[in-house]
A protein has these predicted regions:
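Short, glycine-/Ser/Thr-/acidic-enriched flexible segments
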Residues: 50, 65, 77, 88, ...
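Terminal amphipathic helices with adjacent charged low-complexity linkers/tails
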Residues: 91, 140-157
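A conserved regulatory-domain signal marking ACT and ACT-like small-molecule sensing domains
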Residues: 149-182
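Flexible, glycine/charged-enriched surface loops at secondary-structure junctions
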Residues: 123-126, 137-146, 179
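A broad, low-specificity signal marking well-ordered, structured residues that form hydrophobic/aromatic
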Residues: 43, 58, 138, 151, ...
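Active-site scaffold of zinc-dependent metalloenzymes
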Residues: 134
Length: 182
């Protein structure tokens, strides 16, 4: 891909790091990756993996490419992290249960985290941390429908929601009820 685009290829194992226990090393990664990206105008960086202290490849869990995109967005101080997937953003309900659920236009990081924890899986929940900390919004977009606006994920919104309930997600064997009043 990098050759086709004429961009520099950056091997994730040289800029994304894990500790000896296999945990992501955010501090070292941000330092090395930020420095590398300062010296690079355009690059292709594959997702899903990095390197351990011994240099061997270590992978993120399922959805690791979402995390990689978030890490790179933070390191290059992006104004937006666009995550392209096979759906037009986050939906108000699981399409396997509810026919033709509508996409959510805008959702906060907190609301998305709660939906992800309860089974909504359009974006890996760990992909939220790096960009949220940096104040970078996320836009979930559909590769098969690039004109669709997707779902914008932000810290907070002054926009009045279309619905009282942002979304519904479920997980067998788990119940949580949270009610907030503004």
């Amino acid at each position: 891909m990098a050759n086709y685009l004429g961009y520099e290829f950056i091997d994730s194992a040289t800029v994304i790091f894990f500790d000896e226990n296999g945990n992501f090393d955010a501090e070292k990664t941000d330092k090395v990756l930020s420095k590398k990206l300062e010296q690079t105008e355009k690059a292709v960086i594959p997702g899903f993996y990095g390197a351990g202290p011994d240099g061997n490849v270590v992978t993120f869990s399922r959805g690791g490419s979402d995390i990689t995109g978030s890490i790179v967005s933070k390191a290059c101080h992006a104004s937006m992290y666009e995550n392209w997937t096979d759906v037009s953003g986050c939906l108000v309900a699981d399409p396997r249960i509810i026919d033709n659920p509508q996409p959510i236009k805008v959702v906060t990081y907190r609301e998305l985290r709660e939906l992800s924890y309860m089974g909504a899986s359009v974006l890996h929940e760990d992909a939220v941390f790096p960009v949220r900390k940096a104040g970078i919004p996320i836009n979930i977009r559909n590769t098969n429908d690039p004109e669709a606006p997707g779902t914008l994920i932000v810290e907070s919104t002054c926009q009045k929601p279309d619905y009282t309930i942002t979304g519904i997600a479920g997980k067998k064997g788990f119940v949580a009820v949270n009610i907030d009043k503004d």
